[in-house]
Amino acid sequence: MTIDQLLNKLKFLPRAYKIYVAVLATIELVLFFLRPDTPGLYIQIPQLLPIVAAIPFLFMKGARSPFPRFMNTYGIIVFTFLALDYALGDTNGEGHAGLYQIVTTFIPMAIYWFSQFVRWNVKHFKQKESLIALGLATCAWGFVAFAFPPLPLGPAMFVLLVPWFIVLNKFNRETAVFATFWASMVYNTVNYYWIRNVMNVETAPSGLIFLGLILLIAYLSLFNVLAAFVYSTVKNFMFKGKAILLALFPIFFASIEMFRTHGDFAFPWNHLGYTLGNHLELIQTLSIIGVFGYTILIMASNQIVAYAFPQNGRKKFALFAVPFIIFFALLIHGNSVLSAPEAAPFYDAGNEENPTIAMIQPSIAQGAKWSKERFDSIVTKTFSMAMDSTKPGTNIILLAETAIPDHIRRQPMVIKRLHEMADEKDASILTGALDYKRISRDLNNPRRFEIYNASFLFTPGDHRFPRRYIKKHLVPFSERIPFDEVFPILNYVDLGEGDFVPGKETPVYGPYNWTPYICYDAIFGDLVRDAIHEGSRLMVNITNDGWFGRSTAPYQHLNIVRLLAVTYGYPVARLANSGVSAFIDQYGHYDQNTKIFETRVIQRKMPLKTRSTFYTAVGGFFENALLWFLAVYLVAVFVVSKLKKLKTRS
């Protein structure tokens, strides 16, 4: 190819791409010459590979037109070469991908796609049909947001999503996706508005947290968008298996929820099955089908009612009866379970083998909790409540997550005092605190220490360093940057988030066979199953929900733990620094619930687990099956879509 031919081809290259490459190359070079020694900024041959990788696209007609398709292809190539850069490493053999390179590579693409997103939305906001669909979908998901405890609409969940299914059935795919996205934004904003409270106490800039909140809400909305996209795609199929795929959609939706509980971005906060938590009779079937089974029932009920509207006669009446049948079936089964003598609230609590547990709720304000000047007063208040307000005969005293607001190894006098308190009270004391381990003395290493969010068990008569449990599930972006182990360059990022390392062990403490869970840990069913299989008979959940302020979040957190107690027949002693603390038996009965920001000590004899549930035995298999179902369902939809296109072309 001659130079003239090359220049002729360049004339047809989209102007946006030329600008993109020029800006990328310029910024890369400027950054290199300004700060060539910055950790993570190794703009040498590997760093330039993404630019070099673009050259073949200059000679490929398919990459030039249409431009969006080119951007997709080029994005894949860029990511591939970023991974290659990471593998090649630097002169010291330490693999990484430069942070600046990542930013300068993806920000132009993000700007382009954001502009496309804005244009797409403007188009739909001008269309009457899209606005009608948006109104219906927002009505549906908006009401669902008010169904999660402590809000009251839970029992209506079997019909609340009917307007959304009408949108999916009656409107084209693009309109359905548009309506679902913005309806889900409303839904998730109502559900997670309390994250705004973190801005009042977090160290990161409030504007950055606000941006993070918007991105989180958009990210969570994409799961509903995926469901809408797939449903609308299947709806348009013209083959015999279409009805089967539509009938399996409720399972597909539950599998999306299951997927959301895995990985570094795991956030299993508000599954649809959690909406019935206000009604003890309605949640007893959790012990058989789990929360994802409830999601399947809810989605199936709404889908069937939406399908019933265009039907006639007896068929229509029969389909409209489905939500009532499901509701009363759950109610009858729940009443049957709770009518058994052993299902009485805190049955057999007085048994000698059961421990007496005291929980100390000091309600330390989050803004004051990490103040060095207030450390002594915070610890003194907590310890005084533990010593003065607990009754004789207490076996376990619980202090909240980070009740010691420091790295406990830096506080030898606090450790000594906790040993003395355990001896004086003749009780085990579990307290939350931070801990650390030095892993490097290299001053240039961004992670010279591993930091842990942990709990420590002090037992009477044992003055060795206390037994430690390290929190296993860390809150994304709050306690840890996702994928920082895969991309060590992320360890250089400091946006005010924690930099904790997750734990790996699931302890079972004797003599009462109980297991500690810290905050977020307690909403993951797999951790509960692991502990039960190790012989645990009681969950002890310590948390600090003071971040959430006076909002629905502490009640949502408590509701999830309660539903897990019913699912696995697993009693819970739950202590929150600022509420809501409560005792929960293996059937979900509450006792001594505290109020938010109430200073109080609650204490009782706590019955241990005596119940084996069906879901405990099959839950792991069922949840893994959901993940496989998600993959198979998506592949099936993709294959049929491709076959449909090929048939149309032929």
Tell me the role of every PLM-derived stretch:
Residues 1-10:
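Short, Lys/Arg-rich, polar N-terminal cytosolic tail immediately upstream
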Residues 12, 19-341, 550, 564, ...:
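Membrane-embedded alpha-helical bundles of multi-pass enzymes
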Residues 148-163, 187-194, 361-362, 393-407, ...:
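Short, conserved active-site loops that position catalytic residues or coordinate cofactors/metal ions
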Residues 164, 226, 230, 382-386, ...:
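Generic hydrophobic alpha-helical segments
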Residues 169, 235, 310-313, 387-391, ...:
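Residue-level signal for alpha-helix termini/capping positions
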Residues 216, 372, 405:
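Second-shell loop/turn segments in exported
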Residues 278-284, 326-399, 409-419:
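Membrane-interface segments at or immediately adjacent to transmembrane helices
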Residues 380, 391, 395-650:
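Solvent-exposed soluble domains appended to multi-pass membrane proteins
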